[in-house]
Amino acid sequence: MRYSLLAVAVSCTLVLTACNKSTDTTEPAADTSSSAAATTETTGNATTSTASATSGFKSAENIAMNITGAGASFPQPIYAKWSADYNADTGGQVNYQSIGSSGGIKQIQSKTVDFGASDAPMTPEELEESGLIQFPTVIGGVVPIVNIDGVEPGALKLDGQTLADIYLGKISKWNDPAIVAMNPDLTLPDAAITTVFRSDGSGTTFNFTDYLAKVSPDWNDTVGVDKTVKWPTSATGAGGKGNEGVSSYVNRMKNSIGYVEYAYAKQNNMSHTALKNAAGNFVQPSAETFAAAGDIDWSKQEGFYKVITNSETAQAWPIAAATFILVHKQPENPQQVAGVLNFFDWAYTQGDDDAMALDYVPFSDTAVALFKEKWNEVKGSDGQPVYKPAQ
């Protein structure tokens, strides 16, 4: 059942549930997989559920109920929660490995997983070359996080140019005049800033650097936008694997700054910053500000390729991002891919509460219908779609 997420003052076309919704420096270890057990039986090269068919998502013919995926760490918290609830509801098992967007793209291209996940959308040309489709699942936000004594979550204000200058190494101390000018009520230390960044290929990095390139000509000219970049502060900073690794480093390194998906900041009780957006307003990360940034017409985005950073909407969070799923259009294992679509069909239908609880923003019914229509391009050897969404 799909319904209104929030009373958000943004117009809605083909966008979000928020609108018009009907009913030391050793790499830290992290548990980066999400999996739920299932009661299954093997049928050919796929696994189908033996659960009683009390739900449209259970025990359907030619739909695998044991699927694997890999990729972005940005959505890992919601995919883990969805996986657990999907298992409880249907008996299906989803094993998702949080390895970074680059790894997810490589694995789906190599056909070693049933679906890939990336926060850096593939271009229409890249999708065509790889024989893939992509569709977004939720919108979230990339947030700067800091570890400064006495600075509470949301208290430190930064603008895009200052954030870029920190990661360029131009601003190296917390009491730099540019930071102090925006934070007259804070006592900031005369201490060196340690930058923390991703060491793996990352969609979170893609969106972070895309934002910095839009607000800083120096960043655009010297570093650019990508899932991996040459960090100007690498000699004095630290690289963490996944959002998990960045969170861990910032948590234990005083006077550090990093960037993670908002759920990681909340789950780890970390201090995020406020950011000045393109409209000139200092905003806090929240479902409302993410929704404001994602208020776009997805029907006009070829291949659903869209980067939503630096929105000019008045209350938009400046580093908002959609996260995407990748599957093959002509899969060698159609039952497995049907299982993937079944899982995300369930998530679109049943998973809004989970998403909202973690401050991700689900999509509107209209947008979801558009995404599901794209699934018709995923066909078996008989030329027919491998999956028909539940009614």
Functional labels for PLM-detected ranges:
Residues 20-391:
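Flexible loop/hinge segments at secondary-structure junctions
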Residues 14-18:
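C-terminal motif of bacterial Sec signal peptides marking the signal peptidase cleavage site
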Residues 1-6:
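Bacterial N-terminal signal peptides that target proteins for export
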